[in-house]
């Protein structure tokens, strides 16, 4: 994947504005509420039976931060995303048996959360750049499945 200097700068500028724990929690909360079947992979999280339970669940917050920390690694290693996610792809495929479609759903939720955080700053160009970033991450996470 080729990244222009403008794309790199756009990713970094947006990233600097994010509170990772908040964005991660909100994206995962949105995933679980909008696509409730995705919760089946998170039985160890306890109560995910309602919007309120999901939004206040500390394990959702914890895992959301874990997701965002991995995304941080990707942002700081844009030219090596495929390698960066190799082991995680193996784990999600061989051990966790996660449907790779869920990665796409989470990326959609992340874009929506970015929109709520950035408002008018999420211009079409900014969105396109972040959609590109997340599609590269999703492809890397889904790699073991092919």
UniProtKB/Swiss-Prot annotation:
One of its GO terms (molecular function) is metal ion binding. Heme b binds at residues 63, 92. The keyword Disulfide bond does not apply. One of its GO terms (cellular component) is haptoglobin-hemoglobin complex. Pfam families: Globin. It comes from the Eukaryota. Gene3D superfamilies: Globins. PROSITE patterns: GLOBIN (PS01033). One of its GO terms (biological process) is hydrogen peroxide catabolic process. Residues 2-146 form the Globin domain. Keywords: Heme, Iron, Metal-binding, Oxygen transport, Transport. Red blood cells. Involved in oxygen transport from the lung to the various peripheral tissues. Belongs to the globin family. Heterotetramer of two alpha chains and two beta chains (an easy dimerization is also reported). This is Hemoglobin subunit beta. It comes from Latimeria chalumnae. The gene is HBB.
